[in-house]
Swiss-Prot record:
Residues 29-39 have a biased composition (Low complexity). Coiled coil: none annotated. Residues 1-67 are annotated as: Disordered. A zinc finger (CCHC-type) spans 77-94, 100-117, 124-141, 152-168. SUPFAM superfamilies: Retrovirus zinc finger-like domains. Residues 40-49 have a biased composition (Polar residues). This is Uncharacterized protein C683.02c. Residues 58-67 have a biased composition (Basic residues).
Length: 218
């Protein structure tokens, strides 16, 4: 059996054309986007700088308040050695050589309050008359005596001793009363007023003696 085919011309395909790349065009609103991004960056930078500025201001205010509290505490202090405000005896520049020793016996192991001996203060130096043998509180040239902030003994108006050490008060007729002090006004060297109230001995009432019953026996 024979087969007949159509023997036509051979089909030809088109040749491939070369690929041409085109440059992408930028959108028209690209300038707007750049402006928006730059404005956002500026806002972030300004916000960060303002935040840092606020933190610096807070630190400055905190430091100012701290220094103000220190100055307030120093104003309330009073030195019993040089009679000046702003420091206490332990920090006094004029009394640095003598504060660490006992004014009575000269020992460096204890202070005057802990000394067991009795006698004059040989190692003490007065900061008013600059003489040895007494403290500035007992100096006759000191008008304030033991009361650097003012005041006197409540019984004899003397400034050379405290009210509890006054000789005009007979301790046999005096009972220890309550301690009177104003909070916030007394300093480390200020005398706190010890009030001793005189008590009048009230007559004691005698109880009536009951008569003893007598037993009569028959």
């Amino acid at each position: 059996m024979a087969r007949i085919t159509n023997m036509g011309k051979r089909k030809r395909f088109l040749e491939a054309t070369p690929y041409e790349s085109k440059v992408l065009e930028q959108p028209k609103n690209s300038s707007n986007t750049n402006e928006e991004s730059s404005s956002q960056d500026n806002m972030k930078a300004s916000f960060g700088s303002s935040k840092r500025y606020d933190e610096r201001q807070k630190k400055k205010r905190s430091e100012y308040r701290r220094l103000r509290r220190i100055n307030q505490r120093n104003r309330d202090k009073f030195c019993f050695a040089c009679r000046q405000q702003g420091h206490i005896v332990q920090d006094c520049p004029e009394a640095k050589d003598n504060v660490s020793i006992c004014f009575r016996c000269g020992s460096k192991e204890h202070s005057l309050n802990a000394c067991s001996k009795k006698g004059p203060l040989k190692f003490a130096k007065c900061f008013i008359c600059h003489e040895n043998g007494h403290l500035s509180g007992q100096c006759e040239q000191n008008p304030k005596g033991l009361y650097p902030k003012g005041g006197c003994c409540k019984f004899c108006s003397s400034v050379h001793h405290l009210a509890k050490d006054c000789d005009q008060v007979n301790k046999d007729d005096v009972s220890f009363g309550h301690v009177v002090g104003v909070a916030g006004t007394t300093g480390a060297d200020e005398d706190v007023y010890h009030e001793y109230a005189k008590t009048v001995a009230a007559p004691t009432k005698k109880r009536p003696v009951k008569p003893v019953k007598k037993l009569v026996t028959f």
